[in-house]
Amino acid sequence: YRNLFNEYLGISQQQTDRKMEQIWNHFFVNEKTKVYYESDDNTAYIYDTGNQDVRTEGMSYGMMICVQLDKQAEFDKLWRWAKKYMLYTSGKWSGYYAWHCTPRGVKIGKEPSCASDGEIYFITSLFFASHRWGNDGAYDYNQEAQKILKDVMSKDGSQGVYNLFNTESKLVTFVPEKVYYCLLYTSPSPRD
């Protein structure tokens, strides 16, 4: 990647690398400050300290950080946790991910639901991983991303769940349920 800190601010590559390592250690390594936790089943999650749970946003952002910093082992552990505990494998939400779980992997809430930014960042980080690491390791990252896209774009609304992207407006639907989909309520929409 280009070092924009150097190009625009004159910060050396060595200074940039040192700062990135400090940030990585703060959030992924240091026992007192980290939000990245490994589980006994070769998975890992990102803990949301404000809500005391695990959210698709945090998981997918964590995966994006890992792929950007070339941390494949951590990336794979986060992806493994998300697939194992957050993915809906049956029912009308099949192919979507529960937007929040307990750190033990229990989905929270009575009714299944998702938050679209989680799926979007899962897809994006998996495509990035495909280009960085290839598709011959533990995961075919490209195939994983394509599967999510297929799953979240195959909902016709007949069971109350719609496509992640509104096919008319081309906008991301905040929650792909009828009320949000039909009102074109998107993730960046203002909240009253």
Model-found features: residue ranges?
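Low-complexity, Ser/Thr/Pro/Gly-enriched N-terminal "stalk/linker" regions
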Residues: 1-57, 68-109, 159-164
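Extended ligand-binding groove/face enriched in aromatic
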Residues: 84-184
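Conserved small/polar residues in nucleotide/adenosyl-binding loops
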Residues: 185-190
